[in-house]
Regions:
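Beta1-alpha1 glycine-rich phosphate/pyrophosphate-binding loop at the start
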Residues: 2, 12-90, 175, 179-204, ...
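Rossmann-like dinucleotide/flavin-binding elements
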Residues: 2-5, 9-35, 153-198, 283-331
Length: 344
């Protein structure tokens, strides 16, 4: 007979891994299913990125994050989460996208498609959705947004030396990208719909970007909305309705991201039409669908600046505590005196 897992976790980001660790510590059988690679969103960050937070706030599973820097780098974070996954022997299936969840509490069927088109089905008593939000950008919805020269994800600046680059947006990621591009010799223009840059820009970045704009090193058009992108230009309109065209080689539309609301609705989770917040118990993290739990930024709707790794990593404890009440205690799976918790 096909194995029935106690818990299936959708998503192998830091929050999903933290949930899987709590399941292991509770002696539950668990599987993590991930559409990409381990901590896929972190892997997609710019290669030279440094986190804004300290290493202690990225730790999961009581395993110390050893870093030579107070604020760790992307490379250090990738190494850390690989190490955590190995330490807890977490079972993770990669390149499998979960496309549906059928059944009822205690008897779910989780359907997934592999990268090469194979269809898989897993059975699980409980399901935890920790899919993050970085995969779905907030589209502007204008002509030309689908051109090859437009990207919603910032990478490296070198390729844009002496090129005309527009950065759409005024939040933290837009400010960082604009500064990096400028320092690598690009001709940078910021186009932002609001009158001022976002208040969420980090305090040590704000003076830098504001001074570069003030001195004219980076052009900025505030209260301006992009209307069209063409192969060699970008059109935008200011608050007075005046249209402007500037020559352009590349566009970074850094207008934010959001969770996969369609997937949540597809598996039966109610999503508030106004805030896009899913129906989720704040104490247990269980959704309106009994047996389906939500963890991490996926519960924040469009308010994605509320939940980060720093606080989402604790959702696993809440979830497994509630699952334990329903499934009961599990006997220890330690073998040969080996510790289940590698941090011990």
């Amino acid at each position: 007979m096909e194995e029935v897992l106690d818990i299936l976790v959708v998503g192998a980001g830091p929050t999903g891994l933290a949930c899987a660790i709590e399941a292991v510590l509770g002696n539950f059988s668990v599987l993590v299913v991930e559409k990409g690679c381990l901590v896929n969103s972190l892997f997609s960050y710019p290669p030279g990125m440094t986190f804004f937070t300290t290493r202690e706030r990225l730790e999961i599973g009581n395993i110390p994050f050893n870093s030579v820097n107070v604020k760790p780098t992307r490379a250090e974070a990738l190494e850390y989460y690989r190490g955590v996954t190995e330490s807890y022997h977490l079972p993770v299936h990669y390149q499998e996208r979960v496309v549906g969840v059928a059944g009822t509490d205690g008897n779910f069927e989780v359907h997934a498609n592999t990268a090469d088109g194979e269809q898989k089905c897993y059975r699980a008593r409980k399901v935890v959705v920790a899919t993050g939000y970085y995969d779905i950008p907030n589209l502007i919805g204008i002509p030309g947004e689908d051109l090859p020269k437009v990207s919603h994800y910032y990478g490296e600046a070198h390729a844009f030396y002496q090129r005309k680059v527009a950065v759409i947006g005024g939040a933290n990621s837009a400010a960082i990208a604009a500064l990096d591009l400028f320092r690598h010799g690009a001709q940078v223009t910021i186009i932002h719909a609001e009158a001022e840059l976002s208040r969420h820009i980090k305090y040590w970045i704000r003076p830098d970007i504001e001074n570069r704009i003030k001195e004219g090193s980076i052009r900025a058009y505030m209260e301006s909305t992009v209307k069209e992108i063409t192969p060699d230009s970008i059109w935008f309109e200011n608050a007075q309705g005046e249209r402007t065209r500037i020559e352009n080689d590349y566009v970074y539309a850094l207008t934010g991201y959001h969770p996969d609301f369609d997937f949540l609705r597809h598996i039966g989770v109610e999503v508030d039409p106004r805030t896009s917040r899913p129906n989720c118990n704040t104490k247990t993290r269980q959704s309106n669908v009994p047996g389906i739990y939500l963890a991490g930024v996926v519960i924040s709707g469009r308010h994605t600046n509320e939940i980060f790794i720093e606080n989402g990593r604790f959702h696993g404890k809440q979830i497994i505590a509630d699952i334990s009440k329903h499934l009961g205690a599990r006997p220890s799976k330690n073998r040969g005196g080996e510790q289940t918790d590698p941090s011990q």
